[in-house]
Amino acid sequence: MAAWGCVAALGAARGLCWRAARAAAGLQGRPARRCYAVGPAQSPPTFGFLLDIDGVLVRGHRVIPAALKAFRRLVNSQGQLRVPVVFVTNAGNILQHSKAQELSALLGCEVDADQVILSHSPMKLFSEYHEKRMLVSGQGPVMENAQGLGFRNVVTVDELRMAFPLLDMVDLERRLKTTPLPRNDFPRIEGVLLLGEPVRWETSLQLIMDVLLSNGSPGAGLATPPYPHLPVLASNMDLLWMAEAKMPRFGHGTFLLCLETIYQKVTGKELRYEGLMGKPSILTYQYAEDLIRRQAERRGWAAPIRKLYAVGDNPMSDVYGANLFHQYLQKATHDGAPELGAGGTRQQQPSASQSCISILVCTGVYNPRNPQSTEPVLGGGEPPFHGHRDLCFSPGLMEASHVVNDVNEAVQLVFRKEGWALE
């Protein structure tokens, strides 16, 4: 990402979490209410919410009680959202409509698929790769996700492994007992899609490396690896994420770190990305802003959405990304949109938003009482940098504008700031 992202820190006010994160609760047996059915608008909003999911609304498959309270404030008596809301998650191993259905069941409020942004959703904008033969890595419905993003010629890691069984050698139980005949009929791979963390990391790491080092023909091999290598598009840079366990779990950012380290060690060169998506990339926030705008148009809200409030639990992805996008909006307002790197902009329509305000909650990754928190260490030292290699570390960008206990308090805070009734 371009170096301008490392400008001085925002003058952000820090909050203090006085209460521990509340215990997660199970599904509420209430029928889902439609969240943005078209209807008459009263006091058209000029702000919208970008809500993280894991650690903000849910922990694993259990809803956080504060999320139910928050949505009772966000939804009016007719079952309509009072303000535009988009759910922005770095999850990617699920279909968009499936995630919407999951949220509907958890929140008791019908969520449509076009309110949900998965980590790889902005790949729809990379149309120059949609006709190329792409190797896709991840788990779950990877083929359906890739095709839904516009990629029409996709091969999975498992399909590649079956075509070239001699490539996957770590698991002794899966090694062939006989040597297969070489294949010359397998079409060359032209790029790599990294949609999310795979299940068998050793297999995916090995085969992705084989594709990159062989210029897309892993059955043949090359004496000298090509550089630049084949295009790589990746989503979800989260090193860690929060589920039901007491400590954070490895995210796709950890897998990317492994791949980058192996490539560097083997070739002596840096793995390069044509696109990095998911929080904290600016591209993801631009995509979210566009969905907020379209949602407001469907509701008939004529006033432009000027403020975005991004609520998350991870200082490195949610807070960093919101603050980075805020800087982008400020710079775009004064100087025009800057040029960015792999996580940069592809936006066609000028941004109407003027600010993106970060709100950090204490129900997920962030916990000030945890010694492994991303808070600055004692003695004035800097916290560990959990962000991606291509993000220039600026500690100030991890400083949230507001820190509250949970998403319900975040909604109350925003409504007070905007002069809206809490109920």
Curated annotation (Swiss-Prot):
The region annotated as signal peptide is 1-23
**Keyword Signal among UniProt keywords:** yes
Give the Pfam families listed for this entry.
Hydrolase_6
Give the highest taxon in the source lineage: Eukaryota
The record's keywords, sorted A to Z, are:
Signal
Question: What SUPFAM superfamilies is this protein classified in?
Answer: HAD-like
Task: Name a GO CC annotation attached to this entry.
Answer: mitochondrion
Query: What's a single GO BP term from this record?
Result: glycerophospholipid biosynthetic process
Expressed, tissue-wise, as follows: Widely expressed.
The note filed under miscellaneous reads: Candidate gene for the Cat Eye Syndrome (CES), a developmental disorder associated with the duplication of a 2 Mb region of 22q11.2. Duplication usually takes in the form of a surpernumerary bisatellited isodicentric chromosome, resulting in four copies of the region (represents an inv dup(22)(q11)). CES is characterized clinically by the combination of coloboma of the iris and anal atresia with fistula, downslanting palpebral fissures, preauricular tags and/or pits, frequent occurrence of heart and renal malformations, and normal or near-normal mental development.
Give the family from UniProt. Belongs to the HAD-like hydrolase superfamily.
Q: What is this protein called?
A: Haloacid dehalogenase-like hydrolase domain-containing 5
